Amino acid sequence: MKNLKSLMATKMLIDLQLFAEGDKGQVYPVHNNKFFICTTGRTGEADTIIRGLENFAPAIDGNVESWTPMDEGGWTRNQVTGKGLTLGFSGKRQYGDAGNDYIAGLMTGTGVAVQSKFKWEMPSGATLAGDCVINVTTPAGGDSTNIDTLEFELLSDGKPTFTPASSV
């Protein structure tokens, strides 16, 4: 009987904890992110998915201007004056896939030849889209028993457009 009371008290405590904590939002696996590229440079839409990606790392580089005015008693003031977005990708070279082939085909390109458009569809439904340049860093390679690698950076070229997820 004592064990039953203890079990019931524990269950009640757990139920109360869940009730008290409230909604903490959703979590999603990284593979729910989708990345699209325009395979005609900047003349079309970013509607071709890039297949074979295993990892991505977004990085925002902020330009910060710092100054130390005399009236701040030696404390530094800061202002973010610009930003840049880099999406680093690594994955497998998937021959025959339009998005993967397009990216790998830019390995020797420079200038206008590596300009494109991108769209990042996040698990929440939000999107980030805009102009970009593509820097292929590893078009293939690996150990003899590995699958060919594809690594590249997608760098924003101007301010991308963020569209929040629609609330349903």
Language-model-derived ranges and their functions:
Residues 93-96, 159:
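Acidic glycine-/aspartate-rich tracts in secreted/extracellular proteins
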Residues 99-131:
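Short, acidic/charged, Gly/Pro-enriched secondary-structure junctions
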Residues 1-34, 163-168:
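Short, intrinsically disordered N-terminal pre-domain segments
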Residues 139-168:
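C-terminal or internal capping secondary-structure element at the end of a domain, subdomain, or sheet
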Residues 85, 117-118, 150-153:
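Residue-level detection of beta-strand scaffold positions
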Residues 20-94, 131-148:
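Solvent-exposed edge beta-strands and adjacent loop segments
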